[in-house]
Swiss-Prot record:
Protein name (Swiss-Prot/TrEMBL): Myozenin-3
Key word Acyltransferase present: no
Name of the gene encoding the protein in the UniProt record: MYOZ3
Residues carrying Phosphoserine: 31
Tissues/organs with expression: Expressed specifically in skeletal muscle. Not detected in heart.
Protein task: Myozenins may serve as intracellular binding proteins involved in linking Z line proteins such as alpha-actinin, gamma-filamin, TCAP/telethonin, LDB3/ZASP and localizing calcineurin signaling to the sarcomere. Plays an important role in the modulation of calcineurin signaling. May play a role in myofibrillogenesis.
Region described as Binding to FLNC: 67-110
Organism: Homo sapiens
GO CC annotation terms, alphabetical: actin cytoskeleton; Z disc
Start and end residues of each stretch annotated as Disordered: 79-102
Chain intervals for the UniProt region annotation (Binding to ACTN2, PPP3CA and TCAP): 50-67
Region of interest (Binding to ACTN2), residue spans: 186-207
Length: 251
């Protein structure tokens, strides 16, 4: 659990989060099951409720510690900017009455002026001036500049073909494979195909074995409308007394 002395300043800093949040009235159908669920999760004799409470405590502890550590880091960075002292990477948490509760330090050693590539004196420069700028050779000696004295690698001249040659080309060019690629297997004379294709409206069967009975053709009797349609029409287009003259450019 979080001590009361540590929780107090954090809750004071996070006062806006502790204010009552306006809740939406979801009605009786939704609010009653939610209240029952929270009541079941607050029980002590249920394994699921115990796991839920343990998780809530863990989340609360993480939230308080995260807020406290962020405030401490901001305060420490502001203090270093004002005073001008650079203690390398020191983070202190001063929320409790006893002072700092925990401390994490990271020391970066700057490179010495006489450090060489991979030399023993440049590997761990313990004593360095305070005003020296840290360099990468302090963390990884030997990688501060490109390696010297190493001959450049020769270019690997690999024969790369200009085109692609299919491995089946020699078989395709053979005289037996110069056809169009279709199967020319001769089918026997008495071969019957039993694969039936669905043909609508009683189409012809592919594998029919017995002849269909012949149906005599009976012409459909003509109806009265058909007889009227076949009657000759004596309607003529009305023509005037003057014969049609072709149009000319003079008109």
């Amino acid at each position: 659990m979080i001590p009361k002395e540590q929780k107090g300043p954090v809750m004071a800093a996070m006062g806006d989060l502790t204010e009552p949040v306006p809740t939406l009235d979801l009605g009786k159908k939704l609010s009653v099951p939610q209240d029952l669920m929270m009541e079941e999760l607050s029980l002590r004799n249920n394994r699921g409720s115990l796991l839920f409470q343990k998780r809530q405590r863990r989340v609360q502890k993480f939230t308080f510690e995260l807020a406290a550590s962020q405030r401490a880091m901001l305060a420490g960075s502001a203090r270093r900017k004002v005073t001008g002292t650079a203690e390398s990477g020191t983070v202190a948490n001063a929320n409790g009455p006893e002072g700092p509760n925990y401390r994490s330090e990271l020391h970066i050693f700057p490179a010495s002026p006489g450090a060489s590539l991979g030399g023993p004196e440049g590997a761990h420069p313990a004593a360095a001036p305070a005003g020296c700028v840290p360099s990468p050779s302090a963390l990884a000696p030997g990688y501060a500049e490109p390696l010297k004295g190493v001959p450049p690698e020769k270019f690997n001249h690999t024969a790369i073909s200009k085109g692609y040659r299919c491995p089946w080309q020699e078989f395709v060019s053979y005289r037996d494979y110069q056809s169009d690629g279709r199967s020319h297997t001769p089918s026997p004379n008495d071969y019957r195909n039993f694969n039936k294709t669905p043909v609508p409206f009683g189409g012809p069967l592919v594998g029919g074995t017995f002849p269909r009975p012949g149906t005599p053709f009976i012409p459909e009797p003509l109806s009265g409308l058909e007889l009227l349609r076949l009657r000759p029409s004596f309607n003529r287009v009305a023509q005037g007394w003057v014969r049609n003259l072709p149009e000319s450019e003079e008109l």
